[in-house]
Amino acid sequence: MNLQHHFLIAMPALQDPIFRRSVVYICEHNTNGAMGIIVNKPLENLKIEGILEKLKITPEPRDESIRLDKPVMLGGPLAEDRGFILHTPPSNFASSIRISDNTVMTTSRDVLETLGTDKQPSDVLVALGYASWEKGQLEQEILDNAWLTAPADLNILFKTPIADRWRDAAKLIGVDILTMPGVAGHA
């Protein structure tokens, strides 16, 4: 089972404050473990424009049709001071990893310098921090009914309103997450 370019959808019984009702986009999954970014937990009072200001990045030439008032996500509980930018191609930045044909993760400053300009990737999600699982840990959490999994959908990742991502990600696999009981069993 390789869950790279999949969503983890928190089951209703998962009450951890960071992961409760979360959707995690899995960026890497292999025999050593998994790494992902929570894509539906906006940080309070932090927008992309605020990140650019803190880093003293001024988009030039500024394309006013590109909104920089989008929220920055809490990507996970690890390295909350590090930025992770999920975006559509191109992937010609200094530190980019291609996750799928249509999704790239970049951690270098050069992608931030394109935000708000005509060089910006068409779809962008900025997060601080990430989530990771050790070898076998994620698989066990799935067996323990902590998560549903679904192939990632770019509309949900980049365009769906943040408040709807948890419900809409579950709908990808035919589940109405809002009507699920808080406790699941095994058949």
Curated annotation (Swiss-Prot):
This is UPF0301 protein YqgE. Belongs to the UPF0301 (AlgH) family. Coiled coil: none annotated. It comes from Escherichia coli O127:H6 (strain E2348/69 / EPEC). PANTHER family: UNCHARACTERIZED PROTEIN YQGE, UPF0301 PROTEIN YQGE. It holds the Pfam family DUF179. One of its GO terms (cellular component) is cytosol.
